[in-house]
Amino acid sequence: MLGTLYVVLSSSNEEDYQKVKKELLEVYPDFSVSPYKESQMEKDAVEFFATCQITKEKAKEVLDQLNNDWDGEVDDCIAYGFNTKMFDSLVYHLNFQLYD
């Protein structure tokens, strides 16, 4: 299955993006991470995508490491950093989707 993870960071700093990207790849090295761009969701923030081939079971394991309280099912879920514990404090928003 194809997994896509949309990430919004509450920073527009290149070093912060690189730090979070490194942490994300430590959680799941098979992610292919896109370059970042200015976020349309949040001021002074950046967004990027990470994609991978992943099983539903492995996706659940990875999601549990990225955030402690997802809204939705494993194949379509979101999390916000203001009311949950993210894998990095700079992560403002995550959206994960699985496709057959």
Task: Please state what every model-predicted region is.
Residues 1-3, 36-41:
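Short, flexible, solvent-exposed loop/turn segments with mixed acidic/basic and small polar residues
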Residues 1-25:
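Short, extreme N-terminal segment that most often corresponds to the first beta-strand
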Residues 21-32, 43-100:
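Charged interaction segments
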